[in-house]
């Protein structure tokens, strides 16, 4: 478990910048999915169930002006930066594991 800070800038204006912190990379990736789910709920307020596929999630990530992670590296006592592509790769792995989990 590595402390992870998610940095998000959805719009062109710097005022849209925000961040969240998580106890692990997986928790952070779940947080990115929740951000997208909240976006879908705002766009479709009368839809009782929100469904989407991974390509739609990745398209949403690509529309963000910036999204990146800072992940704590215990060995150096520093945070390492990771970009959109890394985030998408980690989400893909997380969702694939969830899909093949016996409890899914």
From Swiss-Prot:
Signal peptide residue numbers: none
Keywords: Cell cycle, Phosphoprotein, Pyrimidine biosynthesis
Modified residues (Phosphoserine): 24
Highest taxon, organism lineage: Eukaryota
One Gene Ontology term from the biological process aspect of the record: 'de novo' pyrimidine nucleobase biosynthetic process
Keyword set includes Cell cycle: yes
Entry-annotated residues carrying Phosphothreonine: 18
Role description: Acts as an enhancer of the rudimentary gene. Has a role in pyrimidine biosynthesis and the cell cycle.
Protein name: Protein enhancer of rudimentary
């Amino acid at each position: 478990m590595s402390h992870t800070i998610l940095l998000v800038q959805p719009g062109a204006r710097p005022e849209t910048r925000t961040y969240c912190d998580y106890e692990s990379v997986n928790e952070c990736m779940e947080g990115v999915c929740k951000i997208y789910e909240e976006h879908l709920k705002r766009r479709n307020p009368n839809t009782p169930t929100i469904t989407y596929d991974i390509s739609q999630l990745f398209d949403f990530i690509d529309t963000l002006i910036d999204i990146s992670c800072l992940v704590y590296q215990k060995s150096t006592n520093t945070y390492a930066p990771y970009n959109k592509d890394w985030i998408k790769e980690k989400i893909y792995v997380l969702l694939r594991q969830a899909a093949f989990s016996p409890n899914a």
